[in-house]
Design a protein with these regions (language model features):
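Residue-level signature of catalytic and energy-coupling elements of molecular machines
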Residues: 30, 84, 105, 141, ...
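Positions in alpha-helical segments
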Residues: 15-19, 187, 261
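Acidic/histidine-rich catalytic cores and adjacent linkers
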Residues: 36, 40, 195-335
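Inter-helix linker motif
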Residues: 158-175
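RNase H-like nuclease fold core
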Residues: 1-7, 12-16, 36-142, 147, ...
Length: 335
């Protein structure tokens, strides 16, 4: 067993502080959480004081943030990019998660701010590009409905194919409805999203919107807004096992739940910088727990579908992200 002196070096104490704090041990309880190692603990008690541990944890999380935001991305064969906003207290971080052709998930970066802030989201995407991320290939971009985010994606990526998050869409529609009705409508919308084709799903969603438009025009308008983009994965005929991962930003929410779990003892998010450090440390920690996405063997088929989508859009002289063809077909099916 290593002696306590072996842990007195700044690097190892810093690593130990990060490990214990990420395991939800508070600075006050940190010392009691160490394994007993003899009288040397008492002699070196200054190394485990609340302020000393806090300083080491700050340095360790600063290193995790620098590691995350400085990683070389040039070797990633990205097929999908998920972007979402994550709350830490009153602070919001925009988080980017990539899926590569081998099915692995990669935390790519983050920025403090909202998906509604064009400067923030474009800055994050430009940072990914400057670190070597290939933005020239057709890529599935899974996002919420923030216009600033959509605009930034179009500016930075050469051939983005946008999938609007279905979970965000359901929440937005529910926010326009009384609680009881909201739950009923949400169930119907989710059932529509599970239909086997974009054609049938869009026809069903339009029928739901039509039922709502007189009594609840806000909900109807919310459902119709960006409807085709909520069905991009269905239109691309992505295998159902893979589609479950790519039709929403839930993979980011799962990752950030790990961040939140590690930060459960934090009661005062004093700054955006603190939120960035904790979030980055959690993202790096989460990477070690990731499994391949379900249905990853179908990623080559997704890439071919993305390439075909981009080629078809180029032939029509329109961006691939619009997904407009499905809307007219669905209307005909409904008629």
């Amino acid at each position: 067993m290593p002696t306590y002196e072996a842990f007195s070096s700044a690097e190892l104490l810093q690593s130990l502080a990060l490990e214990k704090m990420m395991a939800k041990l508070s600075t006050r309880r940190y010392r009691s959480g160490l394994q007993p190692m003899g009288q040397e603990v008492e002699a070196a008690s200054a190394s485990t004081s609340k302020s000393a541990v806090s300083r080491r944890f700050v340095r360790a999380t600063e290193e995790r943030l620098a590691e995350l935001m400085g990683a070389d991305l040039s070797g990633l064969d990205l097929v999908a990019l998920l972007i979402d906003g994550v709350h830490f207290g009153e602070h919001l971080c925009v988080v980017a998660l990539g899926v590569t052709m081998d099915g692995k998930k990669h935390p790519l970066g983050l920025a403090e701010g909202s998906t509604e802030n064009s400067t923030v989201v474009k800055g994050l995407l430009v940072n990914l590009r400057e670190r070597g991320l290939d933005v020239t290939k057709p890529t599935l971009i899974v996002i919420d409905g923030a216009k600033a985010l959509s605009s930034a994606v179009l500016e930075v990526f050469d051939h983005p194919v946008v999938q609007r998050c279905q979970v965000h869409k359901v929440r937005n529609v529910k926010s326009h409805l009384p609680e009881g009705l909201g739950n009923t409508v949400a169930s119907k919308v989710r059932a529509a999203y599970r239909l086997p084709s974009a054609l049938s799903a869009e026809a069903k969603l339009e029928a739901i919107a039509k039922d709502l438009e007189r009594a609840h025009p806000g909900a109807a308008g919310s459902l119709r807004e960006g409807m085709a983009e909520t069905l991009t994965v269905a239109r691309l005929d992505v295998h159902p096992s893979l589609a479950r991962c790519l039709r929403s930003t839930n993979s980011i929410e799962s990752m950030t739940e790990i961040c939140r779990d590690h930060s459960a003892n934090v009661t005062n998010w004093s700054s955006g910088e603190m939120a960035l450090r904790w979030c980055a440390a959690g993202m790096v920690e989460a990477k070690g727990q990731f499994r391949r996405v379900d249905g990853y063997l179908h990623l080559p088929a997704l890439r071919r579908a993305l390439e075909a989508e981009v080629a078809a859009a180029a032939g029509k002289g329109s961006p691939a992200r619009t997904g407009g063809a499905g809307a007219s077909e669905a209307a005909q099916a409904a008629a």
